[in-house]
């Protein structure tokens, strides 16, 4: 079996994510997170080519939305890219980030609010209700 290097694997996944966004399977899709900005930026020319190929857009994410949907270590302090087609989808993602920050600052980031924001993030990623429930239940590394 041929060995696939990590860069190529992650780029192939991004290709798939762009196709899913283009066809309406996903509203937004996240590339694989990178440990450094420089590592993420190595992908950007390829991501831009993929976006042109599929007619989708790219948002370069330096401060990811952290929710209980994914283990904290998967995204905390990481650098990412978001693929989307409709500006309203990116706007909804950015609004979730603002809403979470406002709740934190107001001391209102309750368990209910945390779950609600994580749930809506999952819906933006076009996950099913069952998929979101499973991710929330299985995540042992929450904020």
Region roles according to the model:
Residues 115-122:
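An amphipathic, hydrophobic-aromatic interaction surface with interspersed Lys/Arg
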Residues 141:
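Binding-interface segments
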């Amino acid at each position: 079996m041929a060995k696939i290097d990590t860069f190529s694997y992650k780029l192939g996944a991004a290709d798939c994510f762009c196709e899913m966004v283009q066809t309406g399977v996903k509203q937004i899709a996240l590339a694989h997170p990178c440990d450094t900005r420089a590592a993420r930026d190595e992908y950007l020319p390829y991501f831009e080519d993929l976006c042109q190929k599929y007619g989708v857009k790219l948002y370069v994410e330096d401060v990811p939305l952290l929710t209980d949907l994914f283990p904290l270590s998967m995204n905390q302090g990481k650098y990412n890219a978001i693929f989307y087609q409709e500006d309203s989808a990116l706007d909804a993602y950015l609004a979730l980030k603002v809403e979470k920050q406002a709740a934190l600052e107001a001391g209102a980031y309750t368990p209910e609010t945390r779950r609600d924001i994580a749930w809506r993030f999952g819906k933006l990623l076009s996950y099913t209700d069952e998929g979101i429930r499973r991710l929330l239940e299985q995540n042992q590394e929450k904020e």
